[in-house]
C-alpha cells in the first residue's frame, strides 16, 4: 500500500532492496534545500522528480548518488547505508546521467561508452571480452552502433545525451539517476530520449521540468516544493489542477487522454493576478 502524501510503502515488511532515501534533509549556504524527503522507487519503474526551479530535485539526485551526504536521514542501497558501501560497488549498481556533459579529450562514441566499464576493471587493466560485449550492447540499445567511430565533438545535443545513457548502461547498473536529460533538446529528441529510458525497465529516477513528458512516460512522480515532498504516487493521481496551482502557481486544465487515461495538461495562465501596481 502506498501513501500518496509520501510515496512510501506503508507495509512494515516492504522490500528494502535497491536505492532509497528515508527522511533526508540537506542544507546549503545556510538554506534548507531538502526537508525530510523520503523516496523509495519501485524496481523496474521510472519515477519522475518534479518541481519548480530550486525545489531540490538535483540535490536529491546527488544525495541518492552519494555525491552529497545528507545532514539527517539516511540513504540505503539494498538495506545498507550508502556511506558504508564501497564506491566501486555503488558505481557497479548505480549510474548517473548528468544534465550537461563535455570533455576536452577527443573521444570516439565507443570510447566514451567504454568509460562505463571503469567500475568493473582494475586500474590499468585492459578491456575484457565481457567489457566489449557490454559496450556493444549499450550502443545497440541506444541506437548508436553506426556512430561508434564518430568523434564526440561532432555530435548533436540529442546524440550526446544518448551517448551518456549508453555509457551508463555499459556500467550494467540496476539503478539509473538522470538530471533533466531533456533540457535543450528539440521535441523529437525529447520524445525519443524519454521512450528510450522508459523502455529500459531499470529502476530509473529522473528530474524533469516538463509535466506532460512526465505524464506520458513516468510510472510514478514525486513533486518537490521548497525542499519538501508535496505529493507522490502514480501520475494519474498526483498531477491534478489543484497541485499544479499550489506548486507552480499557474492555472491548468488536466484531461485524461488515450486508452491508459494518462493526464494531459494545458496551461491557462497565472494562478493569481499580480497585485495592482506590482
Describe each PLM feature range:
Residues 65:
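Helix-to-loop junction immediately C-terminal to a conserved catalytic motif
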Amino acid at each position: 500500500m502506498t501513501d500518496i502524501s509520501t510515496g512510501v510503502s506503508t507495509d512494515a515488511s516492504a522490500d528494502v532492496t535497491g536505492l532509497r532515501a528515508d527522511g533526508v534533509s540537506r542544507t546549503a549556504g545556510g538554506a534548507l534545500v531538502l526537508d525530510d524527503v523520503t523516496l523509495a522507487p519501485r524496481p523496474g519503474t521510472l519515477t519522475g522528480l518534479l518541481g519548480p526551479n530550486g525545489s531540490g530535485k538535483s540535490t536529491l539526485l546527488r544525495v541518492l548518488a552519494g555525491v552529497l551526504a545528507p545532514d539527517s536521514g539516511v540513504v540505503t542501497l539494498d538495506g545498507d547505508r550508502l556511506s558504508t558501501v564501497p564506491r566501486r560497488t555503488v558505481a557497479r549498481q548505480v549510474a548517473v546521467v548528468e544534465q550537461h556533459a563535455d570533455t576536452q579529450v577527443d573521444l570516439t562514441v565507443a570510447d566514451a561508452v567504454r568509460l562505463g566499464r571503469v567500475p568493473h576493471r582494475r586500474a590499468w587493466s585492459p578491456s575484457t571480452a565481457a567489457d566489449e560485449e557490454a559496450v556493444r550492447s549499450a550502443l545497440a540499445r541506444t541506437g548508436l552502433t553506426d556512430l561508434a567511430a564518430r568523434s564526440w565533438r561532432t555530435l548533436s545535443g540529442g546524440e550526446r545525451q544518448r551517448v551518456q545513457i549508453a555509457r551508463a548502461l555499459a556500467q550494467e547498473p540496476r539503478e539509473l539517476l538522470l538530471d533533466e536529460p531533456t533540457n535543450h533538446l528539440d521535441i523529437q529528441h525529447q520524445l525519443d530520449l524519454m521512450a528510450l529510458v522508459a523502455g529500459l525497465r531499470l529502476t530509473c529516477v529522473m528530474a524533469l521540468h516538463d509535466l506532460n513528458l512526465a505524464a506520458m512516460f513516468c510510472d510514478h512522480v514525486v513533486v518537490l516544493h521548497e525542499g519538501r515532498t508535496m505529493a507522490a504516487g502514480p501520475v494519474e493521481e498526483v498531477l491534478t489542477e489543484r497541485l499544479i496551482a499550489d506548486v507552480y502557481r499557474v492555472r491548468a486544465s488536466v484531461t485524461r487522454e488515450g486508452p491508459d487515461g494518462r493526464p494531459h495538461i494545458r496551461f491557462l495562465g497565472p494562478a493569481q493576478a499580480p497585485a495592482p501596481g506590482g
